[in-house]
Amino acid sequence: MMLTCFRDNRWKALVLTAALILPAAGCNGKTAPLFDIGAGTIEAEECLIKSSKKVRNSDLSGGKGVEIPVKEGSMVSFSYDISAASHYDISISYDNQGEDGTLGLFVDGHFFTKVGFPKGAGTVKETITLKEGNGEISFRHLPGDSDITLDCFKLDKSDKKISMVVAPHEDDEILGFAGSIQKTVANGDIVKVVLLTNGDYFDKDLGPVRIRETMKALEVLGVNKSNIYVMGYGDIIIQSLYECSDPGIVFDAPSGYDSTYGDPSSNLYDYHTLDAGNPAKYCYADFRSDLNNIIDTVRPDTVYTTSEAEWHPDHKFGFKAVRDVIESLNKDKGYHTTLCESVIHGEELTWPDKLETDDNGNIKIVEFTDPFPSGGVGRDWEKVTKITLTDEEVYKKQKAIDQFDTQNNGGANFNGNSEFNYAFCKRDEFYWVYVY
């Protein structure tokens, strides 16, 4: 059954309708079924329930409805009209007769997450962001998904906050932000992680390996892989994309790729494939569009990313791209957030101070030293914001860094850099903070 479970009158401002879109051969041009909550009825055409009979339910609060199977190629959509933009908790009751599976959840036409449905029947919950006015929530069967029957759902305004970490490469989210990630998760809030590139400069087969390493590292910190967005662009090309006078020009990355990809073996497809049905090209038009759609759809309360003051071009221009998107959404759509910028690759190669251990092999936990002059980009070390990590949080950060085998130990075409990576196991993390 498909039921909107608004069991009290708190959400009178929310009006929902729903329509199922199946392949044309299945519906034979029929009008899409309408779920009219205002009228207190649910109606479904035969292309939905494979029957010529319409199913009606005049008592939605009684827990009745229409079962809707979401199979390959299908989509279930619900329109909404709300008076105030906010994060909402969507609870979804389902029946999954197969193995553990997923379905794509879309908000206003853009991919939000893959919802996990364990084998059997039950209820799962996701936190989404709905904008003021009219919009649409959809469940779509995506690559890697399973056949799931949706039974009912309900929406409640959420008290959770959403933080987003935008990382140029797989490991930057841990080196710079593992402490903030842990504190956010411990507070019961949500962390989304956006991976701009696949970190595949040294080896064209390295991308999926690094994606899996990040997945394991984030799992150590309590972040589920469903909260990872793999943009899947080429390593060391963000500057070229950002500075190109023609945003439509397609670049070949050093890896040899010219279009986005993810790791299908982990059910982590690239964002553009999930969102639009095909990979994006390595051009700034697609890169900017993907980044804009992710941030605009999620509307995180806080965004963490790397610094314009770094020597690494992906970090420097990744920051510029994130800042540009936030400024545009703030100006054009009234989006408000806090942007936190931190440093991974300082100008001085001796920074950060390497990790030291005592005679028993236990790490000595010390604070970061100021890494370098800010490269003429106006970063004042007297105005930096610091957070303090507990011993347990530092040890978890160390364990998360352990997961990056390629970056710590190297590969056939490159050396590892474990000394640099573990040097980020410090008592503090630091940011320059901008409020929009």
Question: What annotation goes with each model-predicted range?
Answer:
Residues 2-15:
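Bacterial N-terminal signal peptides that target proteins for export
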Residues 15-23:
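Bacterial N-terminal signal peptides
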Residues 24-34:
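Sec-dependent signal peptide cleavage junction
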Residues 32-158:
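Extracytoplasmic
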Residues 156-297, 320-345, 381-383, 400-403, ...:
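Active-site rim/loop-helix segments in enzyme catalytic domains that contact anionic ligands
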Residues 291-310, 315:
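Proline-aspartate-enriched helix->loop->beta-strand connector
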Residues 323, 390-394, 398-436:
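C-terminal regulatory/interaction regions
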Residues 352-407:
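A conserved mid-domain beta-alpha-beta active-site/ligand-binding segment of alpha/beta enzyme cores
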